[in-house]
Amino acid sequence: MPKYRSATTTHGRNMAGARALWRATGMTDDDFGKPIIAVVNSFTQFVPGHVHLRDLGKLVAEQIEASGGVAKEFNTIAVDDGIAMGHGGMLYSLPSRELIADSVEYMVNAHCADAMVCISNCDKITPGMLMASLRLNIPVIFVSGGPMEAGKTKLLDKIIKLDLIDAMIQGANPDVSDEDSNQIERSACPTCGSCSGMFTANSMNCLTEALGLSQPGNGSLLATHADRKQLFLNAGERIVGLAKRYYEQDDTSALPRSIASKAAFENAMTLDIAMGGSTNTVLHLLAAAQEGEVDFTMADIDRLSRKVPHLCKVAPSTQKYHMEDVHRSGGVIGILGELGRSGLLNGDVHNVLGLSLPETLARYDVMVSDDAAVKSMYAAGPAGIRTTQAFSQDCRWPSLDTDRQEGCIRAREFAYSQDGGLAVLYGNIAEDGCIVKTAGVDKGSLVFRGPAKVYESQEAASEAILGGKVVAGDVVVIRYEGPKGGPGMQEMLYPTTFLKSVGLGKSCALITDGRFSGGTSGLSIGHVSPEAASGGLIGLVRDGDIIDINIAGRGIVLDVADSELAARRETELARGAAAWTPVARERQVSFALKAYASLATSADKGAVRDKAKLGG
């Protein structure tokens, strides 16, 4: 029978000092022996997805205490990728994932906490906490802040839906008036919550639900809606039960590694492909799998991408649907229901509620459930009122969207495509693979051949695009922006956005060893592995080289003779210590980022730290 971890600090005469300190935090004799639950919050006033979380940790803590546990809250950092975008701040985004994971480990292990409730929301915070959860393998429940309501405004006598990406595109479009650009900017992000499309934050929150580590509805229920409060109350109550099941009954099914098994990872990736999630999710799932010692690799993602249909198209791939529309259609469980009916899911998995996948679908899939409370929850809709307050409105859609032919979520026979919204490409330029969000690619660009325009920073590429140096038919190559080469694997949202702004969004391709925002669409291929800084062939591409891309064939090839590539490699190696670094790039890199780069692996490994360098 496992012993409560917290007993290390609460039992025995030699722990009198520790107990004295616990008493100073408010604990009493009656509390020693109860499970100590870490409430891992990520409140910050820097991030709209987290600005409303200040009081939610207290809400969870009160429920933990009422359910027989002891709650102790701490906070992690949280970087807003949108605010950090387009300047040196983006170098810190991906490395912050590792810092978050480590800080959770440090706090939980230093104080011997027994279990956790992770209150996350945005891009690197959910993955960082997920990595820590699987590393620590103690009972955990995720409950996120929830999605932002979609923005809405009236232009040319027409009401249109908006999000952050619209503000970025129109702000850089010289044909849009200052007045219209300002109106879009002011309307794009109306409430607290994670940005309203299927960007990285919402994609990851959907995936924690598919993994079984959060409750049904967590990935899609709006941050502003009163119904979301129940998810936090349930999490506080449920985590005490999970802790007692494990520590008092030796029930290992309560542990995250039992819940997030390989079968669960495959289900999560299947969902991701079906909903056309952010390409960043690939990076984060691979990293989380390594922490949980799950044998889940790029090969598994490639295999799944060839058989899973694209069932749900959401912004930025279309402006018709946002997360509030996904929720109205049944949310994550609605998509899983369609996948389950197509025989594409592993049923032998369970979630933090203790329900198997078939049980979860029977209760929460709006297409089959007869539970009025479930249907009412999925009818929770937007209010259209600017606010930074959680649970501030109780509006409901007049009806659910159960149209599986032309609605937000489609049945397999009416899929947008029979192969899904993400694909892995291989070829000489990406021997270990690269990722493209096919959900956002125009059908006319699925096969593309063009000359390379090579840049060694996203800043140089952006300047060239806006300066008219990139023309239709070009393949923009941005290298030395990988985990090691950047360092930090910046998101290339500005170059892809600027391609759209100058009318080249459907007539150019972009490939990079960096990554993309969840807001990216178009023929944007990222995570090229191995990266240039690790000797990858992308580091040998020259201006004018022809690059062939075939998404259906899952191929990406640099059309240069092997003998020429071998000669280029010798030339590069002759640079000595400067080999596999940018030729001319001015970039200030801090000691902290250099430390990150020294251990970073390429994207096909999840950009995690190289354990071999540490003897692990």
UniProtKB/Swiss-Prot annotation:
Query: What is the uppermost EC class here?
Result: lyase
Q: Where is the active site?
A: 517 (proton acceptor)
Q: What is its EC number?
A: 4.2.1.9
Q: Does the keyword Zinc apply?
A: no
Top-level taxon of the source organism: Bacteria
Keywords of the record, alphabetical order, are:
2Fe-2S, Amino-acid biosynthesis, Branched-chain amino acid biosynthesis, Iron, Iron-sulfur, Lyase, Magnesium, Metal-binding
Please name the pathway.
Answer: Amino-acid biosynthesis; L-isoleucine biosynthesis; L-isoleucine from 2-oxobutanoate: step 3/4; Amino-acid biosynthesis; L-valine biosynthesis; L-valine from pyruvate: step 3/4
Question: What are the GO BP annotations of this UniProt entry?
Answer: isoleucine biosynthetic process; L-valine biosynthetic process
Cofactor requirements of the protein:
[2Fe-2S] cluster; Mg(2+)
- List positions binding Mg(2+): 81, 123-124, 491
The note describing how and how many cofactors are bound reads: Binds 1 [2Fe-2S] cluster per subunit. This cluster acts as a Lewis acid cofactor.
Chain positions with N6-carboxylysine modification? 124
Q: Which GO terms describe its molecular function?
A: 2 iron, 2 sulfur cluster binding; dihydroxy-acid dehydratase activity; magnesium ion binding
Catalytic activity annotation: (2R)-2,3-dihydroxy-3-methylbutanoate = 3-methyl-2-oxobutanoate + H2O; (2R,3R)-2,3-dihydroxy-3-methylpentanoate = (S)-3-methyl-2-oxopentanoate + H2O
Please give the Pfam families that the UniProt record associates with this protein.
Answer: ILV_EDD_C, ILVD_EDD_N
Q: How does it assemble?
A: Homodimer.
Function noted in UniProt: Functions in the biosynthesis of branched-chain amino acids. Catalyzes the dehydration of (2R,3R)-2,3-dihydroxy-3-methylpentanoate (2,3-dihydroxy-3-methylvalerate) into 2-oxo-3-methylpentanoate (2-oxo-3-methylvalerate) and of (2R)-2,3-dihydroxy-3-methylbutanoate (2,3-dihydroxyisovalerate) into 2-oxo-3-methylbutanoate (2-oxoisovalerate), the penultimate precursor to L-isoleucine and L-valine, respectively.
Q: Which family does the similarity line name?
A: Belongs to the IlvD/Edd family.
Protein name per the record = Dihydroxy-acid dehydratase
